[in-house]
């Protein structure tokens, strides 16, 4: 292992991890056997990082390749870092720091938190993306800060989106992040893997968001708790990166620790303009052991809508068509990319959004905003009656703006529809794809995009 992180000494069946520069000794006992079957992608990544054969169920201390904090979770993580005796972070170049949830600052407390994080970044020589770049997960991906075989942690539950790049990426709490900031490593219980096998081509105006909502309906909100979802099959092998990001992003909505797409030509073509990355073969062995395997054929998949107040309560759009809405939100780290916005524009055509509702569109990052601007999409949306905002999380987490009053209904392309997620606990949030959102915004009610 890289001694920069820690040294590993194996004594019989006991692993002793020593963090250089600290009086810190970690003991971990693997529970799996060495004569097991082939390995999953998750097991292979941890084996590479730990320098020995690792199996699901093993508890290991593993180095991380990147650690992300934002304006909500970052301040507490930093305070925990100091409470643990931290003076200098383990590696400033591996820490990703930015603001996206409450930007521009919508309260004095938010402004103070951002000042605190700016001062920390300056003192620690950490590059600060600040509030300029967009939503954390989109920024990590488009800056090439996640790559195949890496372990990335983030103080945000949707960190699992980086699995679209072939990384093992997972969300952690602020206490764990404080530890990571100091030591550059973290304890993990290596998860079992559920293989999601897909086949078929998407029908017209049906796409990755509909697929992942249907998978959530099938697996359930806790059906993949502390497991990795491995997305495979010809549907994924032909899926572009934006769709893979959408699916990996929502792995956590089934309780998963991570979502991973085996890296391929699409992955490396995406990364090559963003960073130098060595191509590695990273796929599960034919004889790997899976906790479960599920098969999904998208050939006849209908547009999906998740009804309040859980993501796994997805139904075919026809079951809720005609439901009046007060607001349509198009954006978030799940569906705020250029491809999503282009789909919205295609459904919109020469039409205009229903004037009885609010339509909020937020590109996921500055780069995605500029792509849409150059393509004429922003002007088209504004002309049609939408409010187009600067890249940020917006209404998704009930933050700075776009909140719902009691009794109001939102249709959203985001990833969660929990009670109170976008404002009042007496409001209702439905989740859908960009195509369904656009069609519904035209008529002020949930609408099947195939009928527009």
Protein language model features and the residues they cover:
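Intrinsically disordered, low-complexity segments enriched in serine/proline and basic residues
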Residues: 6, 30-33
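Fe-S-dependent hydro-lyases/dehydratases of central metabolism
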Residues: 34-452
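N-terminal non-cleavable signal-anchor helices
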Residues: 9, 19-20, 136
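Compositionally biased low-complexity segments, especially N-terminal hydrophobic helices
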Residues: 8-9, 333
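Nucleotide/pyrophosphate-binding catalytic subdomain
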Residues: 26
């Amino acid at each position: 292992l890289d001694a920069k992180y820690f040294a590993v000494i194996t004594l019989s069946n006991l692993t002793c991890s020593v963090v250089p520069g600290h009086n810190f000794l970690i003991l971990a006992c693997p529970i799996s056997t060495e004569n097991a079957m082939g390995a999953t992608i998750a097991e292979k990544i941890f084996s590479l990082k730990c320098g020995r054969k690792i199996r699901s169920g093993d508890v290991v201390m593993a180095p991380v390749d990147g650690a992300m904090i934002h304006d909500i979770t970052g301040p507490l993580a930093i305070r925990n870092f100091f409470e643990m005796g931290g003076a200098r972070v383990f590696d400033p170049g591996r820490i990703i720091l930015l603001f996206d949830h409450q930007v521009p600052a919508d309260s004095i407390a938010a402004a103070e938190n951002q000042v605190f994080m700016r001062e920390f970044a300056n003192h620690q020589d950490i590059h600060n993306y600040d509030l300029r770049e967009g939503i954390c997960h989109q920024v990590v991906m488009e800056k090439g800060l996640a790559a195949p075989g890496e372990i990335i942690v983030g103080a945000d539950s949707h960190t699992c989106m980086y699995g679209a790049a072939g990384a093992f990426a997972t969300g952690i709490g602020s206490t764990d992040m404080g530890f990571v900031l100091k030591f550059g490593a973290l304890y993990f219980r290596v998860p079992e893997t559920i293989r999601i096998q897909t086949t078929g081509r998407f029908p017209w105006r049906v796409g990755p968001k509909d697929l992942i909502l249907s998978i959530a309906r099938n697996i359930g909100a806790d059906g993949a708790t502390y497991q990795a979802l491995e997305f495979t099959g010809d549907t994924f092998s032909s899926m572009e990166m934006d769709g893979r990001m959408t699916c990996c992003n929502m792995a956590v909505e089934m309780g998963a620790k991570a979502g991973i797409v085996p890296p391929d030509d699409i992955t490396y073509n995406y990364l090559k303009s963003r960073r130098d990355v060595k191509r590695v073969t990273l796929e599960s062995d034919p004889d790997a052991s899976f906790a479960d395997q599920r098969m999904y054929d998208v050939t006849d998949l209908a547009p999906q809508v998740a009804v309040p107040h859980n993501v796994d309560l997805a139904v075919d759009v026809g079951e809720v068509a005609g439901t009046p809405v007060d607001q349509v939100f198009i954006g978030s780290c799940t569906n705020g990319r250029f491809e999503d916005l282009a789909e919205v524009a295609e459904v919109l055509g020469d039409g205009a959004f229903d004037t009885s509702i609010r339509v909020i569109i937020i590109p996921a990052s500055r780069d995605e905003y500029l792509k849409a601007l150059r393509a004429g999409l922003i002007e088209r949306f504004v002309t049609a009656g939408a409010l187009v905002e600067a890249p940020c999380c917006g209404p998704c987490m009930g933050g700075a703006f776009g909140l719902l009053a009691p009794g109001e209904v939102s249709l959203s392309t985001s990833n969660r529809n929990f009670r109170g997620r976008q404002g009042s606990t007496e409001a209702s949030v439905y989740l859908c794809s960009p195509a369904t959102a656009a069609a519904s915004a035209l008529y002020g009610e949930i609408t099947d995009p195939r009928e527009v």
